[in-house]
Amino acid sequence: MGIPASRSSQIADHASSLLHEAGPVRIRRCRYGVMAYIVHDSYIGRSLDLYGEFSPGEAALFAQLLRPGMTALDVGANMGAHTVLFAQKVGPQGRVIAYEPQRVIHQLLCANVMMNGHMNVEARHAAAGSEKSELKVPPVNYGAAGNYGSLALGGYQQGESVPIETIDSLQLPQCHFIKADVEGMESEVIKGAHETLKRCRPLLYVENDRREKSAALIELLFAADYRLYWHLSPYYTAENYFGNADNIFPGTISINMLAVPKESSLKIDGAREVKSADEDWRVVNAQPQ
């Protein structure tokens, strides 16, 4: 399997795509369905508003990996920009479980799932971690500009109490794919899925953009008998849904790893395999293959 580039398609009309607006929330017809979002959000909201999609390189990879009937987890689902794609790809016989701890963002996630008729999605107002607990989600001003998805949870003493669950506690009969984008807490998610990984051997897609936490995450996945590949995805593509030529994210990429069970026959072409825990993606990906 090759790492796909973002795909081109017929350009949609931006002006007619706006269906509703109330306060900071807009509803727009986007690439993977009708999406509600907060316009002040620096990355996901602005991407949906200007381009009709978010992180197209990631979406293209997910579309290639997911199949009808699969069970897929979206840990750190945010507003559901990828969740609705997951739901489409696994189909009505599949299952999607989406975690989002911020209440307002979770409400948008639920709205987006239901506006697109995805009855196969379970949206959990919770975080996933290494053990059952709870955390405090601090107040967020969603009327002001900010990267709401960058809120690193943990350590707050004040705020709304939200449960932390383990993926193992779900006792899933099958699990084929787990995406984890949880602002540096990816290792905790993996630890809480230890038995699920042993039993189901899902593909994993985990963010790894914090150098101080990278080695521990890589070692954890190596210990679980996974092969790892760097996947760097630009936030902008000229082939976006609205055909918008204005790149507001020049040089901005998301840094992730695709983890494949060692026993899997899946071949990943066009991506750098992670060879050691101390790798720095900046150095490795600057070198010729």
Task: Please provide the spans of the model-predicted regions.
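Phosphate/nucleotide-binding beta-alpha loop and adjacent structural elements of enzyme active sites
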Residues: 1-289
